[in-house]
Amino acid sequence: MSVRYARTQAEKLVERLGRNDTPVNVEMIAEHLGLPVVYAELGADVSGLLISDGTDAHICVQAKDAEVRQRFTIAHEIGHHHLRHQFEPGHHVHVDRGHYISERGPRASDGVDPKEVEANQFAACLLMPTKLVREKVAELGGGPLLDHHVSQLAGAFQVSEQAMTIRLSRLGLL
């Protein structure tokens, strides 16, 4: 798979589900895909888990994380599921009585593991779809984007300012 494929799949999912508003309701998307979301206190370095027995799956999210982080984690785990990432016992994966558990831990954002990079790109495009980002930017008047604009956009999409900055840069808007 590729990052481009992950981005395309996220955009198609948003379009298919008719998500034309901000913020994108990521929990509703998870539920629609048959991925119930559970909030629990996880290890200090774990943001979320995708737990699957091959038939049923659910997402477990760190209850102590900020809401914007939780939303990104849910979208990230949806990405793993939607992209049908196959995990083997080993790095970031634990096998417990036939259940495969994919952790979103500290290496999820280090840019090394291709599956994690794809899931991160999927999450960014799911939470900040190109069409909606461009529409919101146009509503700001068309001038250069300043820090307070990035903050406004991050608030509208309920993502971190860092995530919004990266997304705007990737779209050539910064």
Question: Predicted regions span which residues?
Answer:
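Active-site hotspot residues in diverse enzymes, especially metal/ion-binding acidic/histidine motifs
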Residues: 1-174
